[in-house]
Structures are given as C-alpha cells and as structure tokens.
Amino acid sequence: MTMSDPIADMLTRIRNANTAKHDTVDVPASKMKIAIAEILLKEGYIKSFEIEEVGSFKTIHITLKYGKDKNEKVITGLKRISKPGLRVYANSTELPRVLGGLGVAIISTNKGVLTDKAARNANVGGEVLAFIW
C-alpha cells in the first residue's frame, strides 16, 4: 500500500524516536525529505544525517540531538501543517512565525525548501510544510 503523506510519516518517525529517547531513526529517502533533514541539521535540531543506499532503496539515517542528558529534548514539537487533503500556502508577507520566532516553519518554495526566515529574506512564499520548535 502506498503512503498518502510521506512527509508526515517522516515527522512522526522523528517525533516517536525523540519521545522514546532513541539515538537514531531511519526514514525512507526522497528529495523533499533530504531537504527537510538539511534544514533540521542547519537549524540545530538534529546532530547529523546520512543517506544509506541498499540496492535501489535509499534511507535517511538521522542522528537525534539531546541536551546534556537524554531528558533534555532539543525537538520539543513537530507539526505537519499542509496536508494532502488541505494544502496551506502563504505569500512572503503572510509567512507564519513559530512561537514568536523561537521555532522554525519549513516552506516549500520555487527556490527550494527553505525556513520561514530564509523565505522572508528571499521575498518568496510557498507551501507551509511543517512547524518545528
């Protein structure tokens, strides 16, 4: 059976692994998911990620990040905004701020997948994929 929302599946896998205090999580790879993982790494929400290829099947191996001990989570919340049944778009002036600027909104634009701050600076809008805080 095919997956109706692979991005929500990725975010759910990360959320579940973070809640269970796992060190790593594996996610089936796609260009969009790799771009989201790059944003998570750049913003400091994950330690690292690498793409592993087994035959023709690629997976993203994500290493999660915690505070001094595993009880301090770096990712406190992940929320999928635009869904297959209800797409959410915003222009550059309407881009949302997550927790007053403390979190990050991931936006899919014509210039690639960007954070809300980068999209505002580039003066582009797009589909609001997810919030991370």
From Swiss-Prot:
The membrane-spanning stretches of this chain are: none
The answer on whether this UniProt entry bears the keyword Repeat reads: no
GO cellular component terms attached to this protein's record? ribonucleoprotein complex; ribosome
Q: Which domain of life is it from?
A: Bacteria
GO terms for molecular function, please?
Answer: rRNA binding; structural constituent of ribosome
Q: Name one GO biological process term.
A: translation
The record's listing under Gene3D superfamilies reads: 3.30.1370.30, 3.30.1490.10
Q: Mind telling me which InterPro entries this protein's record contains?
A: Ribosomal_uS8 (IPR000630), Ribosomal_uS8_CS (IPR047863), Ribosomal_uS8_sf (IPR035987)
Q: Which UniProt keywords apply?
A: Ribonucleoprotein, Ribosomal protein, RNA-binding, rRNA-binding
Q: What does this protein do?
A: One of the primary rRNA binding proteins, it binds directly to 16S rRNA central domain where it helps coordinate assembly of the platform of the 30S subunit.
What's the subunit arrangement here? Part of the 30S ribosomal subunit. Contacts proteins S5 and S12.
The family classification in the record reads: Belongs to the universal ribosomal protein uS8 family.
Q: Which PANTHER family match?
A: 40S RIBOSOMAL PROTEIN S15A
| Record's protein name | Small ribosomal subunit protein uS8
Supply the source organism's classification: Bacteria, Bacillati, Bacillota, Clostridia, Lachnospirales
